C-alpha cells in the first residue's frame, strides 16, 4: 500500500519536479529542438522544456512505471540529441584534456570511453562528461545541454590559453562542435540483440566502455557501448541528415520510445548523478563519490585545473559525502533536509529522490556530513514538515547489467 501511494505521487508530481530540477522558465517559442522533434510529436510524445530544449517526457498512454519496467526487462530508445557532442583534435589534445580533467587519458586505449569531470580552479565540478579516445590526437566528448553555455565558454577560454602556451605551440588543439547531430541511446537487456539485426558488426566484441564505427543499414555510425540507465546499451551518434531514418530503424518492436521521466528514474536506481541536482560547481569529485575518475597516476602528480582542492579532499577527507538511502513513508525529493535522529543536528540534504519502480521502495541520494556516510546509518529526512526514517545504503540501488564480455 505504501508503494502504491508512492507510485501515485510519482505519476502526479514527477513532471513538475523534473522541470523544477532544471529551473526552466523558457517560453515554448524560445526552446530549441532536436532533429527528432516532429518524429516525437508524430508518436504522441508529451513535450516539455528541459535544458533549453523541447524534449519528450513520455509517449502516448505509456505510464512512468510501465516505461521504466520495459527498459529494465526489454529495450527502449531515448533521444539525447540535446547533449553537446564535440571533437578535439591536435597533436597535444591528450595533454589539453588532461589539463581540464583529472582523468588518465594518455593510458586510455584507442576507442575506449571514460566518465570524467571538467573542474574549476577550486576543484568544483563544472560538468560531468563522457570522453572517448580515438587516438592520442583525437577525442570525442559529450557534455550536458544544461551546461552548454558555461562549458563552451570555459573550453574556448582554456583552449586559447593552451594554444598560446609553450605546450600548445607543439601542436595546437582544435574544437569542433557537432551542431545538430543526433544522439540516440538504445538501452535494455535486449538492446544488443536488436541492434545486431541491423549490422554485420559483431557486437559481442564491443564491450562496456568501448566504441567503434559500426555499419547500421548502410550508415556508418559512431557507437559507444554504455549509457545512463544501469542496463546494457549503446549511444549512437548520427549526422543531422540521417537522424530521423536511424530513429525509425531503432524504434521498431520490441523497442519502446522512452522519455525523460523514465530516463531519470533509471539513472537514479543506477546511482548515477544528474548535474544541477547531484553535482555543481561547489562539489568536488571526492565529495560526489567520483574519486575513481581521478587517474591513479594523477592523484599526487597530475597537473590539472583544480588539483589543489581535489588533493586536499583526498588527503584530509571531504566535508560531506554523497550517499544513497532507502526512505520510509512518502518519497523524499530534492532539497529535503537530512537530520541526525537523536540530536536533531542538520546533516545535509537530498539531491534526488523517487519511488523506485524496480525495488518498490522510496530511494534517494544526497549529501551528509563526513562520518555519517557509512552503510546502515539511520538518519531522518524531512518531508512536508514531518521527519521520516531513512537508512543509508550503497549505490547503485540495482545491480548494473553492463556487457563486459
What are these model-derived regions, one by one?
Residues 2-10, 20-49, 55-59, 135-137, ...:
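Conserved, structured C-terminal
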Residues 2-4, 15-119, 124:
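Acidic, proline/glycine-enriched N-terminal capping motif
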Residues 79, 128, 235:
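Acidic active-site catalytic centers that drive phospho-/nucleotidyl reactions
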Residues 103-158:
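Well-ordered mid-protein domain cores that form the structural environment of catalytic cofactors
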